[in-house]
A protein has these predicted regions:
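Nucleotide-sugar donor-binding/catalytic module of glycosyltransferases
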Residues: 7, 13-251
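C-terminal subregions of glycosyltransferases and related glycan-biosynthesis enzymes
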Residues: 182, 208-210, 214-215, 226, ...
Length: 346
């Protein structure tokens, strides 16, 4: 049986965050997932404690750590003014399903995923809460991240810079084109998002073929609105024990990654993922979805099928690739000319 307990803590921080005689309008939950995280965990927890708007609860799901992660959490819970709940999985769930479990245990109106090894800027929760308070239709908001070394030194760039997610693309996300943008490729990082708990109605369970952040971003964009916040509110630590890290920036690194990973199995997974998304969208009967979303997912599935054929039938690779280019699918569902060249040479 899984072990769940509430650590010693003060009252809900919603009473501590009163400003100008008014209480915050929302209850805010932090969903923190851990696994052998003792090295950096305390620094992350202390950055949550320094928030100008404290969370109302911290829900920690530990994936059967073998180090002193639980002890670090217990010591922190004994002194912080926030309710801290710790659940230890009896068997390992993996990153995505551990986060899904943490989300399901949260009681707040807003849920903020949290990694075990980053550092939050003090205004992070206040900025995110204000975004949702200002827009009742907003389902998910995400922000940039400043990349830091294992020792906590700034690397000089941000996650969005590495992803080439500039002002034009941010503008598209913020003006109703989030689904089209996120279907092309993911720019939503779990450590840099917040979402309304109501999104879980559509998002859970999370299919095995998706990482939680990409899945939540797509479901939020399909069923509501999404906001990108051009501000690095997290110091995103890069180290060799990370399960998910920042994108590679150098052109050679990108080529090497594509050469190693864009094999037949890659496109089989892409087909599986588009089918999962298509099935889930068809099962959101009470949500008002734009008809274009269904056709876009169907078209991306067709694009993946064609790219898979290129791996199986090398003799017709060139005409297939040229056909996809004329249909504009490399631009809609990939990296444009770069993806076209990959299909010709990889």
């Amino acid at each position: 049986m899984d072990d769940c307990q509430v650590g010693r803590s003060g009252e809900f921080a919603i009473d501590d965050a009163v400003q100008f005689g008014q209480k915050p309008l929302m209850r805010l939950s932090v969903a923190l997932c851990t696994f052998n995280g003792e090295r950096y965990l305390l620094e992350q927890l202390e950055s949550i404690e320094r928030q100008t708007r404290l969370p109302d609860e911290i829900v920690v799901c530990d994936d059967s750590s073998e180090d002193d992660t639980a002890a670090v959490i217990d010591r922190f819970a004994s002194s912080v003014r926030v309710k801290v709940s710790l659940c230890v999985n009896s068997t390992r769930l993996g990153v995505t399903h551990n986060f899904a479990r943490a989300f399901s245990l949260c009681q707040g109106d807003l849920i903020v995923p949290c990694d075990q090894d980053d550092v939050w800027e003090p205004q992070k929760l206040a900025v995110l809460e204000a975004a949702f308070r200002d827009d009742p239709q907003l389902l998910l908001a995400f922000h940039d991240l400043a990349l830091i070394t294992p020792e906590g030194k700034f690397s000089g760039d941000t996650q969005w810079q590495r992803l080439n997610f500039g002002s034009a693309q941010q503008g598209k996300v913020n003006t109703g084109e989030a689904f089209e943008r996120l279907l092309r490729f993911n720019v939503v990082t779990g450590a840099a998002m917040a979402f309304r708990a109501s999104l879980l109605k559509y998002a859970l369970p999370i299919p095995d073929c998706f990482v939680h952040d990409e899945w939540l971003g797509l479901l939020a964009a399909a069923t509501g609105s999404v906001l990108s916040i051009n501000r690095p509110l997290v110091q995103y630590r890069q180290h060799d024990r990370q399960v998910i890290g920042a994108a590679a920036s150098a052109l050679f690194s990108q080529y090497r990654y594509a050469h190693a990973n864009m094999d037949r199995a890659y496109f089989v997974r892409m087909l599986e993922r588009t089918q999962c998304l298509q099935d889930r969208l068809q099962n959101t009967a009470d949500a008002v979805l734009h008809p274009r979303y269904h056709s876009l997912v169907s078209e991306k599935r067709s694009h993946a099928q064609t790219r898979l054929r290129m791996r199986d039938q090398a003799l017709i690779r060139w005409p297939l690739a040229i056909g996809e280019a004329f249909r504009g699918r490399y631009g809609r569902f990939g990296y444009g000319f770069k993806s076209f060249l990959q299909d010709l040479v990889l």
